[in-house]
Structures are given as structure tokens and as C-alpha cells.
């Protein structure tokens, strides 16, 4: 039987709070550090490795974290989620984004519909539509091919799909799968839509309107903006627009769209990149086969999240360490630092996914909690961040845990050798040096140049950003956030009660 208890009532959490603190500066110095780097590794899907050698953990802390995972029933709660339990009690909804990429457990039937079959059906419909666009079977009114796709949406309808598109754009060009350029309109500020429309040939553009409810203010406002632009160009908007929405929304059967593809209430916006929300734009931009590879990578990582052993479950361990840092060590924020320009918008997507999920102060029963919950998430790609906010990370008064992401190879296979090393080698050397510097510090008699060290970090290391690896990376963070929601608030971590309160 699953029980839902506040974090501070769990005996294992009380024990965790009493475990001795790890001096990461000492632990990462010399032979100790080399040993930790080899031992504190967990394999992930698609060739990734999660390395937590520079985190403030040791055997005692890890044992306490394992006890916390067991008492909090993290494995059982995840199993209940993917088997169709009502996890989102605030809105009385199932939580099924993992089901968009694979079947982890039992068949999930909701509203009389097998939901896995429903999601696959939408993916197949999108693939058929995208292939017809690419082949020229579906064209503009003049019989000419569409060359650009523009997604209109906000929040999870923008941040995730935009981040995924940017992550794969160069890979697709290098691997000859690039079909159409994608643009995104999100902000209700008219300059956003105006600038995008000025940058495209509207006669050869297809627009995707994304709104689950069909009533999202910003999205419908921008749709009107786009329709005016099409009308002013002498074009029939209904021949240039498709919708991604729910089957019950006013958009579902409208004649204003070439086609409508469906999502449902069981997919939270910030977890919708593997649903039709991401599927339509990514399939049009890169082809359905690329989107399928992306789903396969996410599904492979989801399977690892089922493991009850925290040393074989990178998402659960990452989540547990994050809770330890937030609730025992008292760190207020976390920086996500991908050393890949392809992931330039990935931190912004994770910022929404994490903070909108775990930025809550009441538990699933509506009761206030007496402890801190989700941290502030921020980040930028390296090495840009090194010349921006790393000053505070190294020498500021707050200790900020760091999540590095690094890759052995770039996407375009173009590089230059300067002083006996390539740019990619310099990039990798930078991230390695930063991990050591944050952990061990650098002594200097000039106090303005002195780095105390003792700043914890972890790194996810992969070979290259490609569709499958991107899917695995996305699933890692989605499932980490989920496990933390289970721990912090017995959480209604999928609900989104305050997004429109100021409107």
C-alpha cells in the first residue's frame, strides 16, 4: 500500500540529516579524487554516464539516501504513475507523458480509451501528414512546397519544442534529415510575432497552433496576428494552419485548419515534447524518423527509472542528492550548465519543467509544508556562462550545486586546431577544469583571486547530441523532477494552478 507523507515526517530523512558532512575539497583532491571519479558513475541510456564524484556524498550518505528512497516508496509511486494511478490529485488526473514514448507497465485505459494506442495513433497521423508535406502532396494554394514551419504556443508548447528543435538543427543538417526551418512565436508582445513573420515567407510557411484547451489567451492572440498577416498577403489562412489541441477543444473540428492532432489532459504542458506538441514541429522540421529516434531515447531512459536500486537508477539518485542539497545542506538554487551550444535553450526548458512542477508549498492534501521545496533553476551553455555568472558560483556567499552536461563530439564535425588541441577538446577541458576548480578551489594570497572550493557538481557525459541521446537526456530530467515531487510534497507536481492568475 502506498502512503503519502511529508518529507520531514520520514524517519529516514531524520537519519539523513544526522549523517556527517562530506568535505568535497578533500574528497576530490589527489588520489582520492581520481578514485571517486572512477567509482561514482552510473550508466545511462544512449551512452550517457551520470558522474557524481564531485557531490557531497559518501558511502554513509548514499546508504541514507537509499533508505529514504525505500521509505518514501519512490519505486512504487513511479510504478503507480505509469500504470495509470491518479497522481495529479489537484486536478484529478492521470500523468501519462512517459506513455507517449513507450509502455512501461500495464495497459492504461482512461475515458474508455487505451492511451498508449491513442498516442501512437497521433504520432502515425503526424508522420503521414509530415511525409505528405515533404513530398509535395500537401502544398500551399499555388501548389508550391512549404519551406518553413512556425509553432504558435506558450509555456510548454514553446520552451520544450523550441529547445529540442535547436538541439537537433545542426545534427539534422549534417545528417541530411533537415526538411524545414522552424520558428516559434510565444510572447503576447506583438514584436515577437511581427519579427518572426518578417523573417519568413508566409506564402511558403505552415503554422502550428498549440493549445490544449483552445482558449489560451497569448496563443489565440498570436493566431489572430498570423491570420491577419496571411490575409494581408492574399492567402487563405485555413490552407496554412494546423492545430495541436485536445479532442474536446473548440479547435478540434474547426474548418480553420488543414488538420488537427490531439493531446489530452493527462500530458502536462512542460512534459509535452514527446507528445503531439513536440511531434508535429519536429516531424515537419526533421522528418518522422528523427522524432521516432527521439522517442526511443526517452523510452530507454524511462526504463532505467524503474530500478529500485539507486545505484542503477540515475534519475532517482540525482533527485535524492538534490533533495539532500536543498533540505539538509541548505542550498537555494541549482545551475544547469550544458557545454554544448546545441543545448542553448535546454536550461530554460528545465527551468519551467522544474520550477513549475516543484515550486509548491502545500502537499497533495492541500496542507502547508514546513520545509523548503524546489530550488531556483538557471543556466547557460558553457563556456558562455564562465564569462557571465561563474564569478558568483565560484566566490559568492551562496553555494550553488551545479549540473554539468558534456559531450565528447560536436555535431557538425568541423573544428580547428589551435595550440595542439581542437576547439572541442578545449571545450571538454574547460568543463573538466571547472569541476575540479569548483570542488578543490585555488589558493591565492590575493583574497580577490582566492577560490575556497567546496562547491558541489555532477556531470552527465555523452558522445554527441543526436535525437536518441536528446530523448534520453530529457527523460532523465523529467523523471528526476518527478521523484523530487514525490519526496518534497507527496506532490501534485503536475498541476499548474497559478499561471494565468494575473490575467
Regions found by a protein language model. Name each.
Residues 118-139, 164-165, 169-203:
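Glycine-rich oxoanion-binding loops at beta->alpha junctions
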Residues 154-158, 188, 245-249:
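Short glycine-enriched loops at secondary-structure junctions
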Residues 137-149, 260-262:
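Short, hydrophobic/aliphatic alpha-helical segments
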Residues 4-142, 486:
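Extended, charge-enriched "interface" segments that sit outside catalytic cores
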Residues 143-147, 178, 330-332:
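A short, charged/proline- and glycine-enriched loop
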Residues 192, 197, 203-495, 499:
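A SIS-like phosphosugar-recognition module
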Residues 147-157, 162-165:
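Carboxylate/His-rich catalytic cores and anion/metal-binding grooves
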Amino acid at each position: 500500500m502506498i502512503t503519502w507523507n511529508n518529507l520531514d515526517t520520514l524517519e529516514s530523512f531524520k537519519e539523513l540529516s544526522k549523517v556527517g558532512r562530506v568535505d568535497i575539497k578533500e574528497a576530490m583532491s589527489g588520489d582520492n579524487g581520481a578514485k571517486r571519479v572512477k567509482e561514482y558513475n552510473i550508466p545511462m541510456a544512449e551512452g550517457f554516464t551520470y558522474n557524481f564524484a564531485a557531490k557531497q556524498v559518501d558511502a554513509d550518505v548514499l546508504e541514507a539516501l537509499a533508505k529514504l528512497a525505500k521509505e518514501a516508496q519512490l519505486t512504487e509511486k513511479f510504478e503507480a504513475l505509469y500504470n495509470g494511478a491518479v497522481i495529479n490529485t489537484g486536478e484529478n488526473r492521470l500523468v501519462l507523458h512517459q506513455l507517449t514514448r513507450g509502455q512501461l507497465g500495464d495497459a492504461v485505459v482512461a475515458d474508455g480509451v487505451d492511451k498508449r494506442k491513442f498516442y501512437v495513433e497521433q504520432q502515425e497521423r503526424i508522420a503521414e501528414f509530415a511525409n505528405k508535406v515533404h513530398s509535395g502532396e500537401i502544398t500551399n494554394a499555388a501548389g508550391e512546397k512549404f519551406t518553413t514551419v512556425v509553432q504558435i504556443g506558450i509555456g510548454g508548447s514553446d520552451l520544450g519544442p523550441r529547445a529540442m528543435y535547436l538541439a537537433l538543427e545542426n545534427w539534422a543538417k549534417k545528417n541530411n534529415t533537415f526538411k524545414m526551418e522552424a520558428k516559434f512565436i510565444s510572447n503576447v508582445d506583438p514584436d515577437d510575432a511581427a519579427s518572426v513573420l518578417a523573417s519568413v515567407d508566409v506564402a511558403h510557411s505552415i503554422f502550428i497552433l498549440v493549445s490544449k484547451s483552445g482558449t489560451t489567451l497569448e496563443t489565440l492572440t498570436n493566431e489572430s496576428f498570423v491570420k491577419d498577416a496571411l490575409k494581408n498577403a492574399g492567402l487563405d489562412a485555413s490552407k496554412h494552419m494546423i492545430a495541436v489541441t485536445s479532442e474536446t477543444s473548440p479547435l478540434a473540428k474547426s474548418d480553420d485548419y488543414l488538420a488537427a492532432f490531439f493531446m489530452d489532459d493527462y500530458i502536462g504542458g512542460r512534459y509535452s515534447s514527446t507528445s503531439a506538441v513536440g511531434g508535429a514541429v519536429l516531424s515537419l522540421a526533421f522528418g518522422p524518423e528523427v522524432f521516432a529516434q527521439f522517442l526511443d531515447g526517452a523510452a530507454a531512459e524511462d526504463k532505467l527509472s524503474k530500478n529500485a536500486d539507486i545505484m542503477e537508477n540515475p534519475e532517482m539518485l540525482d533527485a535524492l542528492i538534490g533533495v539532500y542539497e536543498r533540505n539538509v545542506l541548505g542550498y537555494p538554487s541549482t545551475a544547469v550548465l550544458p557545454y554544448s551550444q546545441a543545448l542553448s535553450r535546454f536550461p530554460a526548458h528545465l527551468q519551467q519543467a522544474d520550477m513549475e512542477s516543484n515550486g509548491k508549498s502545500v502537499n497533495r492534501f492541500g496542507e502547508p509544508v514546513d520545509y523548503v521545496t524546489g530550488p531556483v533553476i538557471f543556466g547557460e551553455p558553457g563556456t558562455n556562462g564562465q564569462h557571465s555568472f561563474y564569478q558568483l558560483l565560484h566566490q559568492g556567499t551562496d553555494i550553488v550545486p551545479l549540473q554539468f552536461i558534456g559531450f565528447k563530439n560536436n555535431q557538425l564535425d568541423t573544428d580547428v586546431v589551435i595550440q595542439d588541441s581542437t576547439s572541442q577538446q578545449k571545450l571538454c577541458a574547460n568543463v573538466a577544469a571547472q569541476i575540479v576548480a569548483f570542488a578543490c578551489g585555488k589558493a591565492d594570497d590575493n583574497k580577490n583571486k582566492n577560490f575556497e572550493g567546496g562547491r558541489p557538481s555532477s556531470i552527465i557525459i555523452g558522445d554527441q547530441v543526436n535525437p536518441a541521446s536528446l530523448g534520453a537526456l530529457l527523460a532523465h530530467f523529467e523523471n528526476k523532477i518527478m521523484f523530487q515531487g514525490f519526496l518534497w510534497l507527496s506532490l501534485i507536481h503536475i498541476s499548474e494552478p497559478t499561471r494565468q492568475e494575473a490575467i
